[in-house]
Amino acid sequence: MIMGSIARRYAKALFSLAVEKGRVEPWSESLQSLKEGVEGSPDLREVLSNPVYSREQRRAIVEKLAAALRLESEPANLLFLLGDRNRLGYLGAIVDTFRALADEHLGRVRAKVTSAVPLDGSAAQAIADRLSQATQATVLLDREVDPALLGGVVAQVGSLVYDGSLRTQLEDLRRQLKQ
């Protein structure tokens, strides 16, 4: 609860600045890259979120990280501020909130699409088009692969789930046969 409200405050402040400067999309992308980089490196995550390391040590790492990702000054300043306040552990929630605000601002929604095998470009585009019709918004797909689905696709947009997986169809058939 507290983490969410703190993350929301930071995200809203940065988002307001991004809107003012017309940099919503680039900052959203660079923040997502930053989040993925931090989450993809357990050692980096440990150093950034562990107060055992001095502020100077964390600041030096944050400076290198910002330079490596070529972050613009404002997103980089967010990193420095989080480091100075021992709140780098909030980064993931801040980025997620920023991206949600950016998507809303730009009139788009994100859909998590899970398939049994990787989707090719045309299949992914067809799914995005169908979901766009259903939601009346531009849909961005976050794709995942789960072989346990056996076949088909499960798409989640917000709280709505469209389940066209073979696994679910087989489970439904099994339930009907038991009756």
UniProtKB/Swiss-Prot annotation:
F(1)F(0) ATP synthase produces ATP from ADP in the presence of a proton or sodium gradient. F-type ATPases consist of two structural domains, F(1) containing the extramembraneous catalytic core and F(0) containing the membrane proton channel, linked together by a central stalk and a peripheral stalk. During catalysis, ATP synthesis in the catalytic domain of F(1) is coupled via a rotary mechanism of the central stalk subunits to proton translocation. This protein is part of the stalk that links CF(0) to CF(1). It either transmits conformational changes from CF(0) to CF(1) or is implicated in proton conduction. The keyword Magnesium does not apply. One of its GO terms (molecular function) is proton-transporting ATP synthase activity, rotational mechanism. InterPro entries: ATP_synth_OSCP/delta_N_sf, ATPase_OSCP/dsu. Keywords: ATP synthesis, Cell inner membrane, Cell membrane, CF(1), Hydrogen ion transport, Ion transport, Membrane, Transport. It is a peripheral membrane protein. It comes from Anaeromyxobacter sp. (strain Fw109-5). It is found in: Cell inner membrane. The keyword Mitochondrion does not apply. This is ATP synthase subunit delta. Belongs to the ATPase delta chain family. It holds the Pfam family OSCP. It comes from the Bacteria. F-type ATPases have 2 components, F(1) - the catalytic core - and F(0) - the membrane proton channel. F(1) has five subunits: alpha(3), beta(3), gamma(1), delta(1), epsilon(1). F(0) has three main subunits: a(1), b(2) and c(10-14). The alpha and beta chains form an alternating ring which encloses part of the gamma chain. F(1) is attached to F(0) by a central stalk formed by the gamma and epsilon chains, while a peripheral stalk is formed by the delta and b chains. GO terms for cellular component: plasma membrane; proton-transporting ATP synthase complex.
